[in-house]
């Protein structure tokens, strides 16, 4: 019997359960136990291979299901003690997952894509290949591109051709340097969003602006001291920049691509293969946390939990507005009135958010090809598909959903969400990725 068949055989015997999370991950920096409430006791009758997993998180909205899973007991309900540790940066998270919990690091956690795929290939881990599995999407939307008040007269917006024609060329001519735009980790989600926004407006991000990496916690100070004029990251940081009157929200990622994929839960494959029942328990707890987060009546409680010093250490009003999608858009601060343009955790107009559609995880690899992020690793569509098929585990999500008792019509069975359309009119058809790449006018 092959390793994979043994794994599936174990899955077939996994007991049905529900989900709860308790939490403390003893991995520096800033390891935390549960936030302001008493952790729920871990169920002792779950018959899991292990009752503990160590996960890393970055304090932005994408991590909310992990924190809520701990605080509200969803993971613990399924017999799993999820120990969360706040990571100082995405680079620290990468280094810690390479170490693994047995080496004092983490087993997995929250990731920008394609970080898990590239860690699996050794492309961002100094050549050390640490195979990982992408298990679920944590959130959709909830990110934005903030601009400094120093360029408020530039009126940067989603549609730069209309609001700010020739802005970047004029800026360079006036200031004697290029406009600086930052992100939190190179060659992943947040750099991809700012690149897509610029390129979709006819601005070549490799020629017309200077792109740089700045850790999320340094966002506010960086904007204040002029390190950068724009920043792409997850809320609450863009919203806080606007609320603190340091800058304004030029565009949200929901405007760039409605119901877009965001960050994902991914875990080392050796942990998953060794602990198939615990993996299913983890997914069930995550799903219940995502369902809870998506209910409007829970937004204020979620904000209160997340705002605590143990978790995000961010003012409560900022998180309340961020979780509800109460943005003020553009230099004029126009209120966003559609809650569906804010962060979504379980359901959207396109269906289930948590399910890791391969069509969506593939897109990040296609963008990596577009910008030649990982030469020698992702140069062709065939390479991208092979990596994607190896890392993205839709089958585990489906198994967990069935055990959780979700109705059959709420459990996706395919690997594609269908055609996707972006703000610039470009369409991504997962059945024809080459057509998507060919349609992109600006690329490397």
Residue map of PLM features:
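Short glycine- and hydrophobic/aromatic-rich loop-to-beta-strand nucleating segment
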Residues: 144-146, 264-267, 271-272
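Short, low-complexity disordered leader/linker segments with a strong preference
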Residues: 1-50, 409-418, 422-444
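Secondary-structure end/capping motifs
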Residues: 275-391
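Ligand-binding pocket segment of bilobal, Venus flytrap-like solute-binding proteins
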Residues: 95, 107, 207-249, 268, ...
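Structured segments of extracytoplasmic/periplasmic soluble domains
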Residues: 69-72, 78, 96, 100, ...
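Conserved C-terminal helix/tail region of periplasmic/extracytoplasmic solute-binding proteins
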Residues: 362-444
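Extracytoplasmic/secreted proteins, especially bacterial periplasmic and envelope-associated proteins
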Residues: 65, 70, 92, 96, ...
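Short, glycine-/small- and polar/acidic-enriched structural segments
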Residues: 34-213, 229-239, 246-259, 433
